[in-house]
Structure formats: structure tokens, C-alpha cells
Curated annotation (Swiss-Prot):
Protein name stated in the entry: ATP synthase F(1) complex subunit beta, mitochondrial
Main function: Catalytic subunit beta, of the mitochondrial membrane ATP synthase complex (F(1)F(0) ATP synthase or Complex V) that produces ATP from ADP in the presence of a proton gradient across the membrane which is generated by electron transport complexes of the respiratory chain. ATP synthase complex consist of a soluble F(1) head domain - the catalytic core - and a membrane F(1) domain - the membrane proton channel. These two domains are linked by a central stalk rotating inside the F(1) region and a stationary peripheral stalk.
Glycan-linked positions: 106
Modified residues (Phosphothreonine): 312
Cofactor(s) listed: Mg(2+)
Transit peptide location on this chain: 1-47
Protein family according to the UniProt entry: Belongs to the ATPase alpha/beta chains family.
Binding site for Mg(2+) 1: 213
Main location: mitochondrion
Catalysis: reaction(s): ATP + H2O + 4 H(+)(in) = ADP + phosphate + 5 H(+)(out)
Protein location: Mitochondrion inner membrane
Signal peptide interval: none
UniProt modified residues of type N6-acetyllysine: 124, 133, 161, 198, 259, 264, 426, 480, 485, 522
Amino acid sequence: MLGFVGRVAAAPASGALRRLTPSASLPPAQLLLRAAPTAVHPVRDYAAQTSPSPKAGAATGRIVAVIGAVVDVQFDEGLPPILNALEVQGRETRLVLEVAQHLGESTVRTIAMDGTEGLVRGQKVLDSGAPIKIPVGPETLGRIMNVIGEPIDERGPIKTKQFAPIHAEAPEFMEMSVEQEILVTGIKVVDLLAPYAKGGKIGLFGGAGVGKTVLIMELINNVAKAHGGYSVFAGVGERTREGNDLYHEMIESGVINLKDATSKVALVYGQMNEPPGARARVALTGLTVAEYFRDQEGQDVLLFIDNIFRFTQAGSEVSALLGRIPSAVGYQPTLATDMGTMQERITTTKKGSITSVQAIYVPADDLTDPAPATTFAHLDATTVLSRAIAELGIYPAVDPLDSTSRIMDPNIVGSEHYDVARGVQKILQDYKSLQDIIAILGMDELSEEDKLTVSRARKIQRFLSQPFQVAEVFTGHMGKLVPLKETIKGFQQILAGEYDHLPEQAFYMVGPIEEAVAKADKLAEEHSS
């Protein structure tokens, strides 16, 4: 790459290279207008969609410059609008370019959706006449595709007649639904303290290695088994190995069935090794697949994005490549716009809903970083994973005091659920405030009432842990899916003091409260023998 830069620097200033220096080719007034406005996308008509290959007679251009993932293409006539997909001709593999800027002199600056190795100036490029189109419909279930809709699971083409552009408008206000309903996940700490709204947006916050991806896998597993719903998983800029593991674990657990058409999930991957263009668009590809199930089949769809931070990071890389001046902490100046354009499409309509769970990597565990902070504005619930809780060996390492939900309201969840949840949070907060005293003076200096608070809080803390079905092979504990009524009942009884006589280790890594009682009996037997 450095060699390429050196060759460009040493080369004579040809017409094509002069175009890279805006001042050499554009008057000052035009410099301010380099980025053309985003095209307005009409409402989708799936039935009318055809295969996304360029049509005969499409506008033809030629490559005039290649700068890493950015390719400049010059057209003699028929300049393609912003966000149109172009296809490079004369290559063994398909290379799609997306128009990002109009530079003047009939030249467009594009972002490549795959590696640009082997591209040469003068190579022919065709305008597809539309944004990137991808296959949608039931045929995508059980399959893995990339950002441009090509299957990457070595199981042949995706046989569907329906294609949809990845760029679309958010639903109109009149189409949206305003009903509130809990999506029961079977995970105690989530259902009790920060319940997910059906059709809402949920953020999974946490640093590296605290269990975001495992929690997402458990949610896919539970929703497929408990609700029978379709899921779409968009792997954005994460490890290829994790994507591969996830696929094989889904096959083993029956979420994906290779023998027939009963698969419950479609996978869309744009992993760490992909160019920034692919990582910046793969979330939209996954969202487009989910929108089809919502709008055409009236489904309640689950959309998982792992990791939404990588979407922002890729946008930052693309922005720098396009020469935009960075804003705070080096992020793109259009950070809020990019995020809002995507998040507003994730919503509940009168036909169906998309509930989105987004893993959010927090750089250096700093929640004030612009990337996680911008995402916060769009969320209905937050599940914050804490390293301090993970260090105690409590998984899922959800912070019960930092995690929030907009629907934690007695009018929506009911007064019993609300009172138990607030009681649990109060006792945990009291325990937190007593920890300094315990650290300095020890437990003996506490009053009897405070000792009881600490005892119950430690039991609650351990009862918030739960063995996951997808982690059975690592933990050796049988995975549990706990109904909401059982969860509320268990915590209500601990708060009431019904289990003050049980040891706290009995509450660790169990499902419903009955299992804690059985575990306590087993521990007592072992101790007596």
C-alpha cells in the first residue's frame, strides 16, 4: 500500500491525478458542494424488483483513480446519482462500488464493497441504475450472505425472485404502531429489571470480553424456541471465527436446518477483514431482509446487530477516505445522521414489528465516547454488561443498577412486576452504599438490619446469574429459560425473607427459585456427609 502511495507521488501529474487535488480542477464555489444530496428513495414495491445486474444500455464509465477503498470513476454521459451501485467489468469476482460524491468533470467518487486489489485505471464500470439490491424473502432463512446479497455459505445461489434496495425511507407516521408489549426473553435479569419492548431498540453495552455475543446467541436461541419468530443476524465488523462458530452452533441447536425450509434465522456478514464500505453498509443489508418479513409477511422480527460500534467505526473510515473534516474524537461529522437514518427504519408498523438488539462495544469502557453516546438517544432499553460483575463470576454480567428500560412502568408491566423490580434495585443499591463500610470496618460493625440487607442482596446478586443453553459446553451447567411469572415470584420471595435460611451459593447459576431450594438441600447433604 505504501509502495502504491509512493508510485502515485512520483508519477507525473496527469489529468486523472490532478482531479484528486480539488483545487486543481474545481473553482472555490464548487468546492463547498462536493457531496451531492442523498437521493430520495420511493416506497418499496417488492413484486417489481428484478435481479440486481446492470441493464443493457446502462451508463458506462472508466476508473481514473484508486486510493485504497475509494475509487474515482469518470462518465462521459449519464452521471449516476448518489448511492447508486456501479459494477466493475472484466473481473472474476463481482466488485460493486457505491457512489458517495460528485467531484465535477463528470467524475464520481465511490466506496468499494470489496477489496480493490488488481483494479487498474481505464477499467470499464457499468451503472446498475439503482442502489445495491439484495435478495429478500423466506429463501434467505438459513443462509449467509454478504453486503451485496451474494451467498457465502457455499450452498449455491439464493433462489428468490424478490430483490430490494438496501437504502429506503423510514415508515410514515401513519403506518407506525404505538402499542406497548413486553418481549419475554427467558433471561431473569433482563425480564425483571430492564424488560425489552416488542418492536423496540435495545443496546447491549460492554467492553471487550464481558459476554455481549454470548447474550445475543442466547436471545436468538430463546426467541426461536419460545416464540417461533424469525431473526436476522447482521455481523458488522466482528471476528470471522465468531461468525463461523455462531453458524455451526445454530445448526447444532436446530435454529438453522440444512435439510428443509424450517430455519428461523438469516445471517448477513461483513466481518473485520472486509473493507470499510462493506462494514458501513452490511447493517442496512440485514435491516432490508428484516423489513421484508415485517412489511410483506406481517412478522414480528428480531434484528441482531453485532456490533453497532463497528458500523460507526466503518463510517468514520469511509468519511476520512472521502476527505471530510473529522469531528469530536476523530469521528465523522455525519455521525448522528448516519445513525439516525438507519435506526429510524427499525420500528413497529401496523403490519408487524422489528425488535432490534444491538451489541455496542464501548471504547475503553467510556460511555461518554461519541459512538455509544449517539446510539443511546435511539434506544428503548439498555442492558449494560459490567466487568466488575463478570469478575465475580456472575453471568450474564448485566449491571442491575445501570440497565434501564422505557417500559419499566406499572401501567405497562403491572404493579407487581414494577414493585419487585424496584425492591431488588433498592436492596442492591443499599448493599453498594454499605460496601465501603464493610471494606474498612468489616461486617461485624453493621447493625442487624444492615446485615440482613447485605445477606439478601448477595443472594439476589447470585440469583440474577443464569446458565445459558448456548454456553452449556463451556460451563457444564444445563441452560435454563425462565418464564416471567417464575422470575417475579422468585425475587419476591427472596425480598420477603422466605429464603434467609438458605446459603447464598445455592442461588448461583440456577433457573427458577425451586432449583435454588433443591441445590441448598443437595449442598446440606454434601456438607453433612
